[in-house]
């Protein structure tokens, strides 16, 4: 129901814009990237055009600042639910600022690219109306994402991004068909090869996403009572698809900033930024891949938190065999995360950048190039939803079992 509401809002267009002028920028790489996170909101310039990009950017900044950059944020991160609420409030406030800046930059940039034909009336009031409308839509998307997280299945923001990608999938398939069409005939053999390749890719993603390293955990009291041990399952890709989502978001920021300076397109700094922060160039794709690796390592630590894990084990009188409690346990978990992050990050990077490199050499469609990242996000999110459904099912069955009345009477 929440996704239906989210999708319905795409038909609420922003007043004061010329849709015909916008349609001429359909192949713009920056808008294509942004559309991946909003489900095509830029096609009719709806209030949902920004999607959740501003919120994701704010999350990245706040989480990075927690790493002993701002002591107050670091302290809040250790205060449990109370501290989390404070950090969430900071994230929302930062989302407001980033949303307004991003919306203003996109509006001015599109207006420049269309030679002033994008806005029906070129005045500050129109810019303010458009920017506020886009920012309001971003907050609505953020709120709906939080509702999904609290009451639905999976991470709400990831689910919203996945829904947006799925909406654009028919268009992506159409681009693929155009790419294998010669004259008026479709090369179905080539098309079949691409579909088989996509199927193999999905299988690899499923295997990597579900693979895990099990670290044995022993509880002194439990071992005496039951003789059974527990284990900590560490996935090969610990943070899931978050590195791909965050790297994709970061790549849109420089392009948005450049929209403020379209008049300086001939300057050297403009060309450098445009070259290194766009997915239509080899250098930009390489930077995108390096960002995926960086976020894989970073969010493996953020998600597991070796410090807290070691402290919790000690409080529960549990330990990892052959590893001393305290700092040695922390270092052991840290080493395991680094060990797993190497194959995990390389896999995420290769799946994301190979289609981009191929598309840049044989096709002008960035949508095809983003197919690897899109399939990765969709598959990862659906696997996580499936895992949660399985957990809820087991919980319900367990509850039914406990509520059943048993009698020892004949």
Swiss-Prot record:
It is a multi-pass membrane protein. Keywords: Cell membrane, Membrane, Plasmid, Protein transport, Translocation, Transmembrane, Transmembrane helix, Transport. Component of the Sec protein translocase complex. Heterotrimer consisting of SecY, SecE and SecG subunits. The heterotrimers can form oligomers, although 1 heterotrimer is thought to be able to translocate proteins. Interacts with the ribosome. Interacts with SecDF, and other proteins may be involved. Interacts with SecA. The gene is secY2. InterPro entries: SecY, SecY/SEC61-alpha, SecY_CS, SecY_dom_sf. The keyword Cell membrane applies. SUPFAM superfamilies: Preprotein translocase SecY subunit (SSF103491). One of its GO terms (cellular component) is plasma membrane. GO terms for biological process: intracellular protein transmembrane transport; protein targeting; protein transport by the Sec complex. The keyword Signal does not apply. It is found in: Cell membrane. Belongs to the SecY/SEC61-alpha family. The central subunit of the protein translocation channel SecYEG. Consists of two halves formed by TMs 1-5 and 6-10. These two domains form a lateral gate at the front which open onto the bilayer between TMs 2 and 7, and are clamped together by SecE at the back. The channel is closed by both a pore ring composed of hydrophobic SecY resides and a short helix (helix 2A) on the extracellular side of the membrane which forms a plug. The plug probably moves laterally to allow the channel to open. The ring and the pore may move independently. It comes from Lactobacillus kefiranofaciens subsp. kefiranofaciens. Gene3D superfamilies: SecY subunit domain. The lineage of its organism: Bacteria, Bacillati, Bacillota, Bacilli, Lactobacillales. The chain crosses the membrane at residues 2-22, 45-65, 94-114, 125-145, 147-167, 188-208, 241-261, 284-304, 339-359, 366-386. Its main location: membrane. This is Protein translocase subunit SecY 2. It holds the Pfam family SecY. PANTHER family: SECY/SEC61-ALPHA FAMILY MEMBER (PTHR10906).
